[in-house]
Amino acid sequence: MRLFDFLANFVPMKKSLAYLPEEKRRDLRQLAAIIREEIKDVVMVILYGSYARGTYVDYDQRTEFGVRTYYMSDYDMLIVTKRRIGANAQSVYGRIDGRFFHNKAKGFHTRPEFINESIGDFNRMLEKGQYFYTEIKAQGVMLYDSKDYKLARRRKLDFTEIGEIAQRYFIKKFAYANGFLEIAKDNFENKESPIKYQMTAFLLHQAAENFLHAIPLVFELYGYKDHKLSALLSACK
């Protein structure tokens, strides 16, 4: 069993935000409180991604292709509800955003990004070992727990289930890779546009990255986070 799977199955989810600066902790407490007020049947609010792992980027400015850009990691948050929020999800997220950014400098303040799952769907994904959701359980921080439900453990899948999951992963990643490859070909042939021509290398890297990501997803049902092609090649051996 992978350490990753062990953590997801047997180690309780983290609850402490002590590793984050006070400003970040305050933001996350505020967001959890607003979510509970705006969504009445919320059962869990989970921080995942770079802020959960402690690998976040607070502010990074650089110049790429002659354009000055800046990057900030988002607060990635999974909102688990009794039933999916549904068609009005974006409206709900907009209200949460509006309240959170009140009296804040929106352009240079960490933004929240939300996804929503019902507790039933979330637990089904955990039982089947869907790597995205299993990773959230293993690495995430529980910001709010109603205590009304327990999270499922990964169970042993039969070969039919393994095949279905692997096929879905393959279709998605292979489609992404081919999409990047087609755009790269078009850009390479369009030498009249220097920017498009220069972007070809980046697009080819994205295509190769997605092709390589597909292999461990299909054979291990695991998605590596690395973007280095050499590391992904090693993972495929």
Segments predicted by a language model, with ranges:
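Metal-dependent nucleotidyltransferase catalytic core
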Residues: 11-39, 58, 65-126
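Short gly/ser-rich loop at a beta-strand->alpha-helix junction or flexible surface loop bordering the NTP-binding
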Residues: 43-57, 61-64
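Short, charged/polar surface micro-motifs in flexible loops or helix N-caps
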Residues: 51-54, 82-87, 208-209, 236-237
